[in-house]
Amino acid sequence: MSQSDQPDSSVTQAQAEEAVRTLLRWAGEDPAREGLLDTPRRVAEAYGDWFSGYREEPRAYLERTFEEVAGYDELIVLRDISYESHCEHHMAPIIGKVHVGYLPRGKVVGISKLARVVESYARRFQVQEKMTAQIAQCIQDVLQPRGVGVVVEGAHECMTTRGIHKRGVSMVTSKMLGSFREDARTRAEFLQFIEVGGKR
């Protein structure tokens, strides 16, 4: 985890709660009102959950691998991994799905570990394009497969609840590495497996 990804440990829970009270006053509310008395604490605790990815090292989830997989060297795909993130521009939710595929080179990881990598990157302030690349590069760096493909679908509430107010819009991003980028057949097989936006 880079230094810039580390949470600022000098900021206390009390300071976080006071920041919420400031926002409530700025919005025109009274933080001392009965219904809002516990809101600062609840918001601070929610942020601790939503952004727990800053306290994790995604690569660590992939360190335990299975090298005896009966010679399996074909495509492995985990699709429809649900995630919840927040955009770094408006701090608004991004909700969607991630599809991950890789061609192993002797190392296979437990499927739950791929989902944990997704969660670790999603539970941070994000830009969808960056998150897509981070997930793919993490898998490539640790497992060193012949190729990696990652496709991310996301509904951005910064677009649906503010600004242009367009509901039902989904953003799709992809990152292809190794054989997924160089071999059109491998890429096509992966995309057929996940069938983004299509019927299954």
Swiss-Prot record:
The UniProt entry, under InterPro entries, shows:
GTP-CH-I_C/QueF (IPR043133), GTP-CH-I_N (IPR043134), GTP_CycHdrlase_I (IPR001474), GTP_CycHdrlase_I_CS (IPR018234), GTP_CycHdrlase_I_dom (IPR020602)
Q: In which pathway does it act?
A: Cofactor biosynthesis; 7,8-dihydroneopterin triphosphate biosynthesis; 7,8-dihydroneopterin triphosphate from GTP: step 1/1
Q: Entry's PROSITE patterns?
A: GTP_CYCLOHYDROL_1_1 (PS00859), GTP_CYCLOHYDROL_1_2 (PS00860)
Q: Name one GO cellular component term.
A: cytoplasm
Keyword annotations of the record: GTP-binding, Hydrolase, Metal-binding, Nucleotide-binding, One-carbon metabolism, Zinc
Molecular function (GO) terms listed? GTP binding; GTP cyclohydrolase I activity; zinc ion binding
User: What is this enzyme's catalytic activity, as reactions?
Assistant: GTP + H2O = 7,8-dihydroneopterin 3'-triphosphate + formate + H(+)
Q: Which domain of life is it from?
A: Bacteria
What's its top-level EC category?
A: hydrolase
Q: Does the keyword Kinase apply?
A: no
Q: Binding of Zn(2+): at which residues? A: 87, 90, 158
Q: Which Pfam families does this UniProt record tie to the protein?
A: GTP_cyclohydroI
Q: Which GO terms describe its biological process?
A: one-carbon metabolic process; tetrahydrobiopterin biosynthetic process; tetrahydrofolate biosynthetic process
Which Enzyme Commission numbers does its entry carry?
3.5.4.16
The subunit structure is: Toroid-shaped homodecamer, composed of two pentamers of five dimers.
Q: What HAMAP family does the database record attribute to this sequence?
A: FolE
Similarity comment: family membership: Belongs to the GTP cyclohydrolase I family.
Q: Which PANTHER family match?
A: GTP CYCLOHYDROLASE 1 (PTHR11109:SF7), GTP CYCLOHYDROLASE I (PTHR11109)
Protein's UniProt name: GTP cyclohydrolase 1
The organism named in the record is Xanthomonas campestris pv. campestris (strain ATCC 33913 / DSM 3586 / NCPPB 528 / LMG 568 / P 25)
Q: What lineage is this protein's organism placed in? A: Bacteria, Pseudomonadati, Pseudomonadota, Gammaproteobacteria, Lysobacterales
